[in-house]
UniProtKB/Swiss-Prot annotation:
Gene3D superfamilies: Phosphoglycerate mutase-like. Substrate binds at residues 8-15, 21-22, 60, 87-90, 98, 114-115, 183-184. Pathway: Carbohydrate degradation; glycolysis; pyruvate from D-glyceraldehyde 3-phosphate: step 3/5. This is 2,3-bisphosphoglycerate-dependent phosphoglycerate mutase. PROSITE patterns: PG_MUTASE. It is an enzyme of class 5 (isomerase). Catalyzes the interconversion of 2-phosphoglycerate and 3-phosphoglycerate. The keyword Chloroplast does not apply.
């Protein structure tokens, strides 16, 4: 049996301000730092060990991983960063307040933008200063690989190659793996692992900073999954994520 630990970054500054974040590189809040440290202490107390960790190129995920590994006294662990684990790109919504958008466009429209499988938000213009196409961390990519907006379907399309080419082979070789990423890149992985339908994925919300454990068979098919720690607290945190896009 293999175990895979997924963890969404701790609360970010734009989570706190209820803004669409996407690829914008915002930092953790003090609460987010403490969430990450708590996760690390919990993983250590439960006896988890890792051989390799994967994360995105956005600081809220990378710093979450730092704090987790620091609490586990495993800061030497090999870490691989990939843009493919970045959050879903929210296009022209990036930086805007979710509740304000709900007041302007209605809760239903914002829910579609936030959670539907195949409907992207309005795209950024290529020359918009919010676009990441001039960011040095993506210098090795073709401009067309850097999105101007994404739906979850698009996020799945960029996350799954990384699963197939890096995460799954590492696990099959016997390595114990943790992935510190984002709400929608984790939703993409969960959708794939659990075979969640395009319609049902709308209802899945990933809470900040709580380790999600998957137990997988030799073919990396899920046997079960669960949040570490207080299950009721995890459910409440997921419900709070769901309510962010309401007026």
């Amino acid at each position: 049996m293999h175990k895979l630990v997924l963890i969404r970054h701790g609360e970010s500054t734009w989570n706190l301000e209820n803004r669409f974040t996407g690829w914008t590189d915002v930092d953790l809040t003090p609460t987010g730092i403490e969430q990450a440290k708590t996760a690390g202490r919990l993983l250590k107390a439960e006896g988890y060990e890792f051989d390799l960790a994967f994360t995105s190129v956005l600081k809220r995920a990378t710093r979450t991983l730092w704090h987790v590994l620091d609490e586990m006294d495993r800061t030497w662990l090999p870490v691989e960063h990939s843009w493919r684990l970045n959050e879903r790109h929210y296009g022209a919504l990036q930086g805007l307040n979710k509740a304000d958008m709900a007041k302007q466009y209605g809760d239903a429209q914002v829910l579609v933008w936030r959670r539907s499988y195949d409907t992207p938000p309005p795209a950024l213009e290529a020359g918009d200063p919010r676009s990441e196409r001039g960011d040095i961390r993506y210098a090795g990519l073709d401009p067309e690989q850097i999105p101007l907006t994404e739906c979850l379907k698009d996020t799945v399309a960029r996350v799954l190659p990384f699963w197939n080419e890096r995460i799954a082979p590492a696990m099959r070789s016997g390595q114990r793996v943790m992935v510190a990423a984002h709400g929608n890149s984790i939703r993409a992985l969960v959708k794939y692992l659990d075979g969640i339908s395009d319609d049902d994925i709308v209802g899945l919300n990933i809470p900040n900073g709580i380790p999600l454990v998957y137990e997988l068979d030799d073919d990396l098919k899920p046997l079960r999954h669960y949040y570490l720690g207080d299950a009721e607290a995890a459910a409440k945190a997921a419900a709070a994520v769901a309510s962010q896009g309401k007026a």
